[in-house]
C-alpha cells in the first residue's frame, strides 16, 4: 500500500496535467459540430490507456461515437475486473453561468472547475 501512495505522490502533478488536458477537449457528444472533438478525446483516452500500461487499447467504431477499449492481462487465472466510464460531456449551456470557460479548467479552493470535471 505504501508503494502505491508513494507512486501517487510522486506522479500527482503529471496526473493532474493529464486530467486537465482531457478537460480542455470539448467532447460534447450531443452536438454533431463537436464530432471531431469527441474523436480526438477518444484518441487521447486510448493513448492514456497505453501509457498507463494496458497491453491493448483500441477505438471501436459504432453507429454513434466510438467506444474506447483497453485491457491489461496479468494472470488469466484471476477474475476479470471491468472499469467503465465515459469520455464525453454534456453541452455547457447556459454559458453565462460559468465563471470561466467550460473547457478552460481552473482550480479554485482545491476543486477543478470545468465541464466534465
In which residue ranges do the predicted regions lie?
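Acidic/His- and Gly-rich active-site-bordering loop/insert found
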Residues: 1-117
Amino acid at each position: 500500500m505504501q508503494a502505491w501512495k508513494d507512486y501517487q505522490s510522486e506522479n500527482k502533478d503529471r496526473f493532474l496535467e493529464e486530467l486537465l488536458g482531457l478537460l480542455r477537449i470539448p467532447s460534447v457528444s450531443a452536438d454533431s459540430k463537436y464530432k471531431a472533438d469527441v474523436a480526438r478525446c477518444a484518441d487521447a483516452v486510448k493513448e492514456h490507456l497505453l501509457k498507463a500500461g494496458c497491453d491493448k487499447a483500441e477505438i471501436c467504431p459504432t453507429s454513434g461515437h466510438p467506444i474506447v477499449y483497453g485491457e491489461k492481462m496479468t494472470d488469466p487465472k484471476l477474475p476479470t475486473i471491468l472499469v467503465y466510464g465515459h469520455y464525453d460531456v454534456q453541452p455547457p449551456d447556459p454559458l453565462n453561468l460559468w465563471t470561466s470557460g467550460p473547457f478552460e479548467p481552473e482550480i479554485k479552493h482545491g476543486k477543478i472547475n470545468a465541464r466534465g470535471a
